[in-house]
Amino acid sequence: KAYELAGGAGFWGAETDVRMTKDKKFILQHDLTFKRLCGVDKKPEDMTLSEIQKLTIKSGNNISKYKNVKSATTVATLEDYLTTCKKYNMVPVIEIKMEFVEYGNETTNDSRMQAVTKNNMEDLYALTNHIMGNKEYMFIAYDFETMVQMRKVLDDNATTSTNVKLQHVTNNPDQGMINYYKKRKIELDANCDKISLSDIKAFNDRG
C-alpha cells in the first residue's frame, strides 16, 4: 500500500528491502524477523511464502488507518512491488538485505543479513528484469561482495544497458575503494552526513 501511495503522489522512486523465504521466493522485509511488524518471532528463511502471506501486519506508520486494506496488512512480494513501481513509473531501488556466500550454508559476517548465493542473485535479477524490462532500476547493498557478485550476474547475462545501476551503501566512504568501484561499475551510496568534501571531489575526479 505504501508504494501505491508513493506512486500516486508522483514520487521519482521507491526503496525497499528484499529478503528470501524458505522456498526461495523474494519478499519485502527490513527486519531479521517478523516480530516487530507481525508479532511472530520467525525469520523469512524459516517460513514458506504461503506461511508468510498468512501473517498480518499489525504495526507500522498509519497501520490503524489501513487495517482493513489487504495490501497494507499482508507481507508483499517483490513482484507486487515491481508491478506497482512499473505502473506508476517509479524507479525501484532494491536493497539486497542479504550477504553473498559461496555455497549457501556459511555464516554471514553480519548477523542481520541472510546468506545468498550467486544462483539466488541470478533469480533476483531474472525476476526484476522480467517485470521491469528496459525501465530503470537499481540494486543496492551494504555488503560490497554482494554488489560484486551482482555485477557478475549482469555481465553473465550480457547486460550492458545503463538502465540497471548498482550501488554500494556505506557509512564510511573510503577513497581507497575508488578503483574497485570504477572497475566493477559500482556507484557509492553514502549518507551526506558521513561523506566529506574531499571524498566527493575524489570520487567526482575519477568519474
Q: Which positions does each model-derived feature cover?
A:
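Phosphate-group recognition and catalysis centered on beta-loop-alpha active-site segments
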Residues: 1-207
